[in-house]
Amino acid sequence: MQTNPAAPETGPEPTDTRPTSPSSGAVPPSTASAPSAASLPTPGEGLPGVPAPAAELARVAAGRAAGALAGPAAVRLGDVVPAPGQVLPDPAGDFTLSADAVLRVSPAARDVAEQLAGWLRPATGFPLPVADTTEGGPLTLTLSPADTAVPSGAVASGPASTGREAADVAGGEPSGATARTAGPDDAGLGDEGYRLDVTVGGVRITAGTPAGLFHGAQTLRQLLPAPIESPAPVAVRWAVPGGTIVDRPRFPYRGAMLDVARHFFPVEDVLRVVDHLARYKLNHLHLHLTDDQGWRIAVDSWPRLTEVGGATAVGDGPGGWYTRDDYRRIVAYAARRHVTVVPEIDLPGHTNAALVAYPELAPGKVAPPPYTGTEVGFSFVDPADERTYAFVADVVGEVAALTPGPWLHLGGDEAFKVPADSYRAFVARAQRLVAATGKTVVGWHQLAPAEHVDGRVLQWWGTNGDDPETADAVRRGARLILSPGNHAYLDMKYAPDTPIGHDWAGLIDVRRAYEWDPARHVRGVPAEAVLGVEAPLWTESVTTIAEVEFMLFPRLPAVAELGWSPRETHDWSRFRSRLAAQGPRWTTAGITFHPSPELPWPPTTPGIPTQPTPHTTPTTP
């Protein structure tokens, strides 16, 4: 159970009593909170620190969200984001969670069950004990890691499908539940798929792996009424719509990037972002750890990287960095939520902070002044000096040793002052140094001309799908993560009056974030070469976790759906309705979000306890 409603979702997290290390330079969160719905101004008034157009949007959104939750609308089986692959509703099979419910699990499923119980206990007030048994009982939630295929009957694809009659299948249901009917095909759930069955007697989540169980548990969370996000007990009927969902991801890599180099974000903020990713079945968090303005990860063999390079940020703001234990904590927290951390050490450019700390790495061997602006392309490590490669080997070696995931991101973008031949030679050596650690090289698509190393992944952030160099790299064996700047860059403004963000790649409203196909975006790149999608958030103008959330929501779930859901489920009109229904959940959970006028936000009525927003509302940079 959460004891701090504004804290990340912890559940029974492994005990860690260490205080935040003063050397981490973590910036204490602001104690100011976002305006409550009750304190919002009347039309024509403004919010402190927010320009009038943005204040009006905030007022409208808060007025809509002020209480859409007291009499929550019924949730339909397909009202889930990302859209499930196959849905077979059974209106006669609705289940109601009650105070005597028990989560019955096999031992391998206990951790997922404990997390699920932790999500549900505050709002329901139910004890929801977890029992190590798969023997069912009345009003029981059952999770099993076994991938049990059942005969396929009526198959329904897409979230708007309606059920058909099918043959009964005996056995395996919670005692007191109606027999499960054959429905969508659950063969081949893979590493992350799951099957969720809801009957009048209980809920069963079936998967082949804990990750699949976790994704199924997140789906169940969305199938409960929106007040389930409340930090205090709410007297509503905790109904779950009946039927069957069979679901698996379209792409294996689904992620978001948080730039902690331009502005530093304390560990607790990063953990909160992990929770947001996990909620929408994103499974990778890319941390942009180094840039001109700051170096954010401790490297024992090069201590001045953080002691000196970690002291600055954009706009002369306070710097900060993660100690090794800080980083381990982030990695472990993410892993428990089936999110893999992808660390980025940006090379050879974007290195001013490193050069301030170690001028021998600079081409002129003179320390540049610290940089707190937002220009790019002026800094680089000396590709002709052997000390540079000793530095790279030490840094990637230490970061790789702290990172259990398979990836290490080398950056590689915007090294404008490095001659092309020197750039290719540097990247070739740096890639081999990463490969020597056992990690798979990831880099921005500017790495494309360099020699290929086995497994190499390019992250494509262009705005024009015609990219012959990237297509050639794919022909040589590279795979792609799609992050098109004009669709997936979440630091772009929603509209001209958005109070924070950029517009160099255009404005990205929710529809633009949703309406593109990763499998067909770069010409000459076949669908099978696309590993997945990632939504980057650069933070030159983003300074608090509330501002991070404002830029993530509601666009992050749009990119998440592109990565998870089958192409045939993609439909803007249906998506916007499903996405708008998330608004009351975000309000109750204390998540700051942009009240996009594109979405039909539900009508609201007051009355549900909400979690406080973590810091402040967005302000102009």
Regions found by a protein language model. Give the residues of each.
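Conserved, mostly hydrophobic/aromatic
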Residues: L103, T209, A256, L277, ...
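Flexible, acidic glycine-rich loops studded with aromatic residues
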Residues: G125, E451-R456, W461-P621
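Feature activates predominantly on carbohydrate-active enzymes
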Residues: L189-G377, Y389, G397-A400, P404-W407
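Hydrophobic faces of well-ordered beta-strands that scaffold small-molecule active sites
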Residues: R254-L258, L285-L287, V341-I345, L408-L410, ...
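Active-site beta-loop-alpha junctions enriched in small/polar residues
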Residues: A261, T290-G294, E344-H350, D413-A415, ...
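Active-site neighborhood of glycoside hydrolase catalytic domains
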Residues: P359-E360, G364-V457, W461-D472, R476-G477
